[in-house]
């Protein structure tokens, strides 16, 4: 028995060293392609002028920390979820609440609008993803029509519909992501590869939508093929949890925000990190990131209650937005790019333009 154990340990050690040497070779190959820096290419690009954005609407109604939000494709409605166990659908123009659902658990960490605008999905510490159809009848009991779609073995950290209402992608504290059929609740594909809790995901913006990116507590951002379930690219340059990932509008790159107080840009074609957005004065983690419609600006919410706006090409900060009275937990640009909404632990959401 002892010799078996010894043999196993030797095999493990040799496999580990082989993996390390392969990692080294990969890094060498990546370095060969690294012939220019983004800021050098951007030197010819004109700098952005003075940039002013203000809070245009404040959405009040949650009784505790706002944890997640998403825009409807109609560019007007917003869904938000909170630690108070409530999920609220808002009219961002009037600040009216159109629907409210009380979940069976507190800490509703994930919510998403269906592409049709006719349903919302949400979940959190109940380990599952629930889909609620939205109707115009205010008296109808939404909870009665609830569908439980996804079941994880730990908390649900993020969810997103694919390009139709029929499938939903989820990320969980159990270290996996999964693709589910909404109608049957059947698991279509699972994605294993993160070494710790998965905290965020984002679907590629292409019409086919066959890839998505995820980030987690293992400091990694991973790109997945939804058809095969395989990880096709992995990036491990952050020094702490990856809290947020967002595809560049063209789909050729993505940004990440981390507890290491930096945001980073990864080019998928160059297969490497191409920019870091940080300042010595920023010492708090970035909780949420999103791009402007053109991709020139990166909005990032931080745990020091601020929102920083970065010039993606130059790597410089062009604006800093104050207003929230606690950490900014979630942030999304509207589908038409005219505004963005932020949610905070101060119990409110703010629409900026």
From Swiss-Prot:
SUBUNIT field: Component of a complex composed of RGS9 (isoform RGS9-1), GNB5 and RGS9BP; within this complex, the presence of GNB5 stabilizes both itself and RGS9 and increases RGS9 GTPase-activating protein (GAP) activity. Interacts with RGS7, forming the RGS7-GNB5 complex; within this complex, the presence of GNB5 increases RGS7 GTPase-activating protein (GAP) activity. Interacts with GPR158; promotes the GTPase activator activity of the RGS7-GNB5 complex in absence of glycine, in contrast GTPase activator activity of the RGS7-GNB5 complex is inhibited in presence of glycine. Interacts with RGS6.
Keyword Hydrolase: no
Primary location recorded for the protein, binned into one broad class: membrane
A GO CC term attached to the entry: protein-containing complex
Pfam families: WD40_Gbeta (PF25391)
Main function: Enhances GTPase-activating protein (GAP) activity of regulator of G protein signaling (RGS) proteins, such as RGS7 and RGS9, hence involved in the termination of the signaling initiated by the G protein coupled receptors (GPCRs) by accelerating the GTP hydrolysis on the G-alpha subunits, thereby promoting their inactivation. Increases RGS7 GTPase-activating protein (GAP) activity, thereby regulating mood and cognition. Increases RGS9 GTPase-activating protein (GAP) activity, hence contributes to the deactivation of G protein signaling initiated by D(2) dopamine receptors.
Highest taxon of the lineage: Eukaryota
Subcellular location: Membrane
Signal peptide coordinates: none
MF-aspect GO terms: G-protein gamma-subunit binding; GTPase activating protein binding; GTPase activator activity; protein-folding chaperone binding; signaling receptor complex adaptor activity
Family, per entry: Belongs to the WD repeat G protein beta family.
Tissue localization of expression: Detected in brain.
Source organism per UniProt: Rattus norvegicus (Rat)
Protein name as annotated: Guanine nucleotide-binding protein subunit beta-5
WD repeats: 61-100, 103-142, 151-192, 194-236, 237-276, 278-320, 323-352
Alphabetic keyword roster: Membrane, Repeat, Transducer, WD repeat
GO biological process entries: dark adaptation; G protein-coupled dopamine receptor signaling pathway; G protein-coupled receptor signaling pathway; light adaption; negative regulation of voltage-gated calcium channel activity
């Amino acid at each position: 028995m002892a010799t078996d154990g010894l043999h196993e340990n030797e095999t493990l050690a040799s496999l580990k060293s082989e993996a390390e040497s392969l990692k080294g070779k990969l890094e060498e190959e990546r370095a060969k392609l690294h012939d220019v820096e983004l800021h050098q290419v951007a030197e010819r690009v004109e700098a952005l002028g003075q940039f002013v954005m203000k809070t245009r609407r404040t959405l009040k109604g949650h009784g505790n920390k706002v944890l997640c939000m998403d825009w409807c494709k109609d560019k007007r409605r917003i869904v938000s979820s909170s630690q108070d166990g409530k999920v609220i659908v808002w009219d961002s123009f009037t600040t009216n609440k159109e629907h409210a659902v009380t979940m069976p658990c507190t800490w509703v960490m994930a919510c998403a609008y269906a592409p049709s605008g006719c349903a919302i999905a949400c979940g959190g510490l109940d380990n599952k993803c629930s889909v609620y159809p939205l109707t115009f009848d205010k008296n109808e009991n939404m909870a009665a029509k609830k569908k439980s779609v996804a079941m994880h073995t730990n908390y649900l950290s993020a969810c997103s519909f694919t390009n139709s209402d029929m499938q939903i992608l989820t990320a969980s504290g159990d270290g996996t992501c999964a693709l589910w059929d909404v109608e049957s609740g059947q698991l279509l594909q699972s994605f294993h590869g993160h070494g710790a809790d998965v905290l965020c995901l984002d679907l590629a913006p292409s019409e086919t939508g066959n890839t998505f990116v995820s980030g987690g507590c293992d400091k990694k951002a991973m790109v997945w093929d939804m058809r095969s379930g395989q990880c096709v690219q992995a990036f491990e340059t952050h020094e702490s949890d990856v809290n947020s990932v967002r595809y560049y509008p063209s789909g050729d790159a993505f940004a990440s925000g981390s507890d290491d107080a930096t945001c980073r840009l990864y080019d998928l074609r160059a297969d490497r990190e191409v920019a870091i957005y940080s300042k010595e004065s920023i010492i708090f983690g970035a909780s949420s990131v999103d791009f402007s419609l053109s991709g020139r600006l990166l909005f990032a919410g931080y745990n020091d209650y601020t929102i920083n706006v970065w010039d993606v090409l130059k790597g410089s900060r062009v604006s800093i937005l104050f207003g929230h009275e606690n950490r900014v937990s979630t942030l999304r640009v509207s589908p038409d790019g005219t505004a963005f909404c932020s949610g905070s632990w101060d119990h409110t959401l703010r629409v900026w333009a």
